[in-house]
Amino acid sequence: MASDGQTPIGYDVDINKALAKVMGLKEGTTKHSEFPTIIPALGTKFDVGISSFTITPEREQQVNMVSYLNVGSAWGVAQGNPKNFDTSNPCGTTIAVQTGTAQETYAEELSTQCVADGKEKISVMPHELQTDIATKIISGQYDATLADSTVIGYTSAQSEGKIVQLGETFESAPQGVAINKDDEELTQAIQAAMQYLMDNGYLADILASYGAQDAALTTAELNPTVN
């Protein structure tokens, strides 16, 4: 999100504009919406949803998904890890996540396991905006954040290193563009346009601007098989 708090920015915004251009459309309108509300609004309020959606069997039952990235999860902490956060033992800590993401689910599962092991639960703090999370991590309100590895990398760059990745990337999974299942024509157009961006290096170029070029896939699959 830009400094005005209203204008969406990031590689998904740039990819969305590139898809529209390939499809011969005007640039179109990119609107910000709370993460959990995007998929239910496809086909009514929105034509396409592109917001780091991890492809899951549950989402593929709701909408068509066209893959374009393979992204893992990563821990982010303030520079120097002042809270001494231990990725191998997050029990009893306060962790920020973006609402509705795979990381929110994963953090809740970790917390449940902590309690089952007789340890203190994790305080999982959902937020709509990653920028809000970054501010609270830097100020010391939270111990760590859990997000897409590409998000952690971008946040680190934007914060000039005030937030850094801690540990290795894990739980890699494909992400996709979401389209209403009833709109087969738009689905096919998005898949073809995404493949064009891949084949001609445009997708990698866009991602490189955010340090995320290694996440690019080479085949835009429709509803790929996932666990």
Feature names for model-found ranges:
Residues T105-V124, V164-Q165, Q195-N227:
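Ligand-binding clefts/hinges and TM-proximal coupling segments of bilobed small-molecule sensing domains
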Residues G28-P40, P82-K83, I122-T135, E171-A173:
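Short helix-initiation/N-cap motifs at beta->coil->alpha
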Residues M1-I50:
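Extracytoplasmic small-molecule ligand-binding "clamshell" domains
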Residues A78-I95:
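Flexible hinge/capping segments at coil-to-helix
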Residues A2-S3, N16-K26, Q103-P126, S156-Q158:
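Ligand-binding cleft/hinge of the Venus flytrap
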Residues N70-V77, A157-Q195, Q213-N227:
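Periplasmic-binding protein-like
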Residues V13-V22, T94, T101, V177-D214:
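Extended ligand-binding regions for polar small-molecule ligands
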Residues F53-E60, E108-E109, S139-E171:
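A ligand-binding cleft/hinge motif common to bilobed small-molecule-binding domains
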